[in-house]
Amino acid sequence: MFYLSTFMTIVISLSLVSCSYDCNNPGYSCKGTCHYYGPCICNEKLMGYDCSVLKSRMSTGSNCTVTCQNNGKCYDGSKCLCSSDYTGDLCEKQTTGARCTLDAVVFEAYRPIGFVGETYLSQSRSCKLLETTSDVPGMIKFERKIFHGDTSMCGLKKHMDIPSAGDVTYEADIYSTFQYNSWGTRDFMDNVKCQYKPTRVGLSMDAPDSLFPIKMSARDGASSNVQATTQSAPISLLFSPQNIPDVKGAMVDYLEVYSINSTSKEYKSVVAVKNGCAQKNEYNVAFSNLDELDPATSKWIGLVKMQAFIIFENEPILFNYRLRFCPDRCTTPTCAAPXVGQATSAAV
């Protein structure tokens, strides 16, 4: 029999930014004394980067019902006092940072009401972050999405990290000016990074699908969610994007099929798809890397057709994969003619 399990290979790290508060800048409040050099000086009763909270309001232990992130401190039992670099109910959002999606970097900046400046990538003022609907009360939100492959003046800087082979960093310098069309000593520059690591994070077929950006399933002619089948039977692996609003298509870029002998711990693997192209393999198994439209979600889902095969007797087959996410249907890579026969064209 042929058993299915899965392995996910993409992890998105946080971006790194610098401090971005100067009480002299328009829009920023200071309930203490605003120092010429930018910090807000609190008296003995106040705390916070802007001296906005009385020390007597701080909560600890069982008196606090929320978990504040990024060194935020709990007060009034259910609120978080953030540092100047973070905002949001739980201090979960960077004031200048990024969302690291699988095919792009979405730069984000939160500025106070009264902000009259601009935020843009260092390459050009035309690479501005544009105002969008804010999800933080009392803050204006600016945003700009740059795809990894963007070759315009607003394109990202890309680095292959050494010695961690496989790690890739995309970054940009962000200028924040507090007066329109100007630059001064109270303005800021932040270096924002997204690092993509091939670290493996496991999931099983019965794990809650809602936890992951991809739902992987398998089907044959009789079942739409098969977990066991016979050797040489046709089977299709489906990779459905979910929880990522700007992803409308997915296609397999890399697929490795592997198994581990539970007694000897020996590991064997087969690279089935590389750079989007089916690969020749020692088991003479044919693979086809495709996609198909899911009528239920109107999204293009990754589809790999193959035949079930055994690496180790009585051991499960597992999958290590990397997907390419696209804002619409992914373009099909140009591949050399496969060295083995094409997978069956019968619907499975």
UniProtKB/Swiss-Prot annotation:
GO terms for cellular component: extracellular region. Residues 1-19 form the signal peptide. Residues 60-92 form the EGF-like domain. It is found in: Secreted. Its main location: secreted. Residues 99-342 form the ZP domain. The keyword Nucleus does not apply. Keywords: Disulfide bond, EGF-like domain, Secreted, Signal. It comes from the Eukaryota. Prismatic layer of shell (at protein level). Expressed primarily in the mantle with highest level in the mantle edge and lower level in the mantle pallium. InterPro entries: EGF-like_dom (IPR000742), ZP_dom (IPR001507). Disulfide bonds join C64-C74, C68-C80, C82-C91. The keyword Ribonucleoprotein does not apply. This is EGF-like domain-containing protein 1.
